[in-house]
Amino acid sequence: MSVRRRISEADGAAAFAQVRQVFDTVLSGEKPLISAENRTEIEQVFARLPRGVRATAVRYALDELATLAPGNSVEVRVPPYGVTQCIAGPRHTRGTPPSVVETSGFIWCALAAGALVWDDASASGLLTASGERSNLSRYFPLF
């Protein structure tokens, strides 16, 4: 079963290119990844992007994950921008799904761009992941 994308490839790629530029501009030199020391600065630059660009980039990355890992056993929440389900396994029909991942739009885009590593984000509390299938580290970076 194919996943129906909510964001067109052209719109999503254009929005994500703007997000990637934030990471590429700030993350140069010897520290290629987001760290506790530079996260606030990068997040402020990300927040200055138009809301529509941020929303489109997040939704595009959610669509990409759902395409790479189709299924319904993990729900990925990135409030207020979007949600998707992915990973094959037990399907839920009501209530909380068996596995849930939740994070901010900034962290989601950083993971998708490869500017942040899943294990670092999880260990530092920048995302929450519960359930046996909630470790999505093998899918990142998405782009």
Question: Which residues make up each language-model segment?
Answer:
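Feature captures hydrophobic
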Residues: M1-F143
